[in-house]
């Protein structure tokens, strides 16, 4: 609306300056020519048409001035294709226990959006039965201070730590999983035959939709986050002789 306002003001000023002023600061002549009014009206109509017909941006969010406080249209979060079970917008830190309730992002008291089942999230997963062990040990946490990330094109982008929705500040959390130790045992991964295999644990990644900024415009982008810990195997070279 700010661009439309400035456009209308500019058109109005051009229309005024097009007519000469007398010393008494009164427009000279009896009336403004009809052709001039027609041209001015046409300019206003064109500006209004462009404002209404302009394609909607990916999301209705802009940076106000030089601040980092970004206001987001709550309808944005109703697009299910943008949801990810590893991304959460919340006004408070999410619980990390196995009996945690589902975390929803509610706007205006209406039906919740960004609904995902996170009750299974825990920092010590998975749960094994007696005698069972994980090849690699992993740890999972909700990350709330992510400021930069690598997008799907390999470029570094700025991640929005928080957004303003209906005058409420929501933090953007990422549920990340990584290896606790690259070598849970001296030989590498647990349970691997070290006589024939070299092994080590490594963190793997996936891409999730997250709110980022570029040129003072907020937008959804795929960014890379840590999501699992796996064991990498290399066969040992056979000894000759």
Curated annotation (Swiss-Prot):
S-S bridge residues: 136-201, 179-229, 189-231
Q: Name the GO terms of the biological process aspect.
A: cell surface receptor protein tyrosine kinase signaling pathway; modulation of chemical synaptic transmission; negative regulation of neuron apoptotic process; nerve development; nerve growth factor signaling pathway; neuron projection morphogenesis
Region forming the signal peptide = 1-18
The entry's localization annotation reads: Secreted; Endosome lumen
The positions flagged as glycosylation sites are 69, 114
Keywords, A to Z, come to: Cleavage on pair of basic residues, Disulfide bond, Endosome, Glycoprotein, Growth factor, Metalloenzyme inhibitor, Metalloprotease inhibitor, Protease inhibitor, Secreted, Signal
Name the Pfam families for this protein.
Answer: NGF
Which Gene Ontology terms cover its molecular function? Answer: growth factor activity; metalloendopeptidase inhibitor activity; nerve growth factor receptor binding
Primary localization:
secreted
Give a short account of what the protein does. Nerve growth factor is important for the development and maintenance of the sympathetic and sensory nervous systems. Extracellular ligand for the NTRK1 and NGFR receptors, activates cellular signaling cascades through those receptor tyrosine kinase to regulate neuronal proliferation, differentiation and survival. Inhibits metalloproteinase dependent proteolysis of platelet glycoprotein VI.
The similarity annotation says: Belongs to the NGF-beta family.
Q: How does it assemble?
A: Homodimer. The homodimer interacts with a single NTRK1 chain. The homodimer interacts with a single NGFR chain. The NGF dimer interacts with a single SORCS2 chain (via extracellular domain). The NGF precursor (proNGF) binds to a receptor complex formed by SORT1 and NGFR, which leads to NGF endocytosis. Both mature NGF and the immature NGF precursor (proNGF) interact with SORCS2 and with the heterodimer formed by SORCS2 and NGFR (via extracellular domains). The NGF precursor (proNGF) has much higher affinity for SORCS2 than mature NGF.
Q: What is this protein called?
A: Beta-nerve growth factor
């Amino acid at each position: 609306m700010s661009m439309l306002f400035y456009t209308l003001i500019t058109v109005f000023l051009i229309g005024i300056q097009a007519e000469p002023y007398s010393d008494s600061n009164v427009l000279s002549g009896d009336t403004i020519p009809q052709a001039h009014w027609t041209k001015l009206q046409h300019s206003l109509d064109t500006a209004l048409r462009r404002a209404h017909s302009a394609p909607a941006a990916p999301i209705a969010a802009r940076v106000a001035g030089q601040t980092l406080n970004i206001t987001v249209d709550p309808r944005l979060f109703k697009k299910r294709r943008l949801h990810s079970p590893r991304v959460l917008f919340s006004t408070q830190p999410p619980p990390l226990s196995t009996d945690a309730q589902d975390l929803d992002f509610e706007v205006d008291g209406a039906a919740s959006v960004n609904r995902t089942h996170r009750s299974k999230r825990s920092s010590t997963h998975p749960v094994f039965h007696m005698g069972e062990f994980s090849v690699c040990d992993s740890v999972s946490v909700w990350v709330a201070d992510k400021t930069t990330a690598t997008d799907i094109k390999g470029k570094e982008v700025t991640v929005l730590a928080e957004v303003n929705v209906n005058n409420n500040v929501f933090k953007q959390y990422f549920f990340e999983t990584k290896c606790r130790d690259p070598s849970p045992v001296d030989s590498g991964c647990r349970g691997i035959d070290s006589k024939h295999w070299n092994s080590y644990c490594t963190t793997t990644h996936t891409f999730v939709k997250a709110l980022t900024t570029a040129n003072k415009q907020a937008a959804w982008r795929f960014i890379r986050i840590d999501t699992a810990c796996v064991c990498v195997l290399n066969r040992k070279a056979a000894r000759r002789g």
